[in-house]
Amino acid sequence: MVVGLFGGSFNPPHQGHALVAEIAIKRLGLDQLWWMVTPGNPLKSRNQLAPLAERIAESERVAADPRIKVTAFEQALGVSYTANTLARIKARNSHVHFIWIMGADSLQTFHKWQKWQEIARTFPIAVVDRPGATLSYLSSKMTRTFDFARVDEDDARILWRKSAPAWTFIHGPRSGLSSTAIRNGAVPGAVK
């Protein structure tokens, strides 16, 4: 089984997140995508962070595809930081092939994540295009550090077979929706 792991605060979740998930399912040939709602992000302010239960319920509403499973692994496992969460998930599911999925906008700060290189050396990574990040991803520390491990986008469907480090950049339809803009009221009438 091939499972994509798509984590974030999803504050709030919106159709742009669902689009990233759908692109990942299709282009990577995923059997499932685990939409991992985090209790919080140490790199972001918690001032406007909606309660976890609310973000989970909204994520379930937005993620209509039955292959998408909305989870709160970090809270359930009692861990924080993505690297720790992923290590626990992998240890409990040794029969599953995992791919870490992230939007290209998150790639610019990926090097600030705790144990980011460990994540890249443990899981193949699929970076999905986001507005404003199409070219900037090339200058990210992750892509420079692991340039040798890039998998051509045409081979994205076999990314799960690659030993980490391995990563690909996936182009596709993009949504201009942003959780920050929605929270700040900059997207009037936005469908979350």
From Swiss-Prot:
Catalytic activity as recorded in UniProt:
nicotinate beta-D-ribonucleotide + ATP + H(+) = deamido-NAD(+) + diphosphate
So what EC number does this one have?
Answer: 2.7.7.18
Q: Which Pfam families match?
A: CTP_transf_like
Q: What class of enzyme is it?
A: transferase
What HAMAP family does this protein map onto?
A: NaMN_adenylyltr
Which family, according to the similarity comment?
Belongs to the NadD family.
Report the protein's function.
Catalyzes the reversible adenylation of nicotinate mononucleotide (NaMN) to nicotinic acid adenine dinucleotide (NaAD).
**What name does UniProt use for this protein?**
Probable nicotinate-nucleotide adenylyltransferase
Q: From which source organism is this entry?
A: Rhizobium etli (strain CIAT 652)
Specify the taxonomic lineage: Bacteria, Pseudomonadati, Pseudomonadota, Alphaproteobacteria, Hyphomicrobiales
Per the record, the gene is nadD
